[in-house]
A protein has these predicted regions:
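Low-complexity, acidic/polar, glycine-enriched regions of mature
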Residues: 20-200
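Residue-level detector of intrinsically disordered, flexible termini
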Residues: 7-8, 19
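N-terminal signal peptide c-region/cleavage motif recognized by signal peptidases
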Residues: 15-17
Length: 200
């Protein structure tokens, strides 16, 4: 899936004193996960999936201590083919099928933070690591994120690169199907652009 505020946005190590331990809930109405997938020849598709739920925790110094979120895989949409509704519907149907995300069997994907590494040069920037679960398989991913936290609210942004083949999603992969011509090869990696918002 071309993979997501998807959750990195909730992890911030901000050296602010005066906060009590606090857990904030993701606001699905203010959070988005965008996806982008590409082919070897350069073409690309993009769209969104909805955030279903999630939370993030900060300690009394304002430092992120944990977080997680759930994505509704049945909500996948496409944006770049709006001018071709028949093709758009076909693409979304294919992405939802067993060739890709098999959303009937696996209606959600999720991420759980396992580590936050602060950026010493910027209090709002960090590297987040955690367990990403998709299609019934879990792999660790890490990515840079920018997060702000103040007065019971948090916002975060990140771009996460996912190697779909590590989750068993091998359709169209040139690394697994050597007979594919270049115009049929789909990149193993896709991107999720996360823009997440949380509040009490």
């Amino acid at each position: 899936m071309k993979l997501v505020s998807f959750s990195a946005a909730l992890l911030s190590v901000v050296s602010i004193s005066g906060y009590a331990n606090e857990t904030l809930q993701l606001d699905p109405s203010l959070s988005t996960v965008g996806w982008k997938g590409t082919k070897k020849m350069g073409s690309a598709h993009n769209g969104e999936v909805k955030v279903k739920s999630g939370s993030v925790s900060f300690d009394k110094s304002g430092q992120l201590t944990g977080g997680s979120f759930v994505i509704d895989m049945k909500s996948i949409t496409n944006e770049d083919l709006k001018g071709s509704p028949d093709y758009q519907k076909k693409l979304v149907g294919h992405l939802s099928s067993a060739d890709f995300f098999d959303v009937e069997k696996h209606p959600t994907a999720s991420f759980k933070i396992t580590q936050v590494k602060p950026n010493k040069k910027s209090k709002n920037e960090m590297t987040i690591a955690g367990d990403f679960t998709m299609i019934g398989k879990t792999q660790q991913v890490s990515f840079p994120a920018k997060v702000t936290y103040s007065k019971g609210k948090a916002n975060g942004e990140a771009v996460v690169k996912i190697d779909r083949t590590k989750f068993g999603l091998k359709y169209g992969s040139g690394n697994f199907f050597k007979e594919l011509t270049a115009d049929k090869i789909i990149s193993d990696e896709f991107e999720l652009t996360l823009k997440l918002a949380a509040k009490k």
